[in-house]
């Protein structure tokens, strides 16, 4: 939820922020990076849903939940770092 919120705010900022007369979001490298981050968030969300399904079905899910926990921490740091970069001086 936190990574998704950060990314949504950054996308809105990139739409509003103009660089050399064009929105920051018009830059292809920005689009690719934001798409990659959104893809990773969605992949982690699906892994979490998979863990919940396993837990509800009373299946062993220790390995999957450990993977999700590790990936979540890394992804939040990665998204926060990229969002900070896109916000530039306003990120602080």
Predicted regions and their residues:
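Alpha-helical interface subdomain recognition
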Residues: 1-92
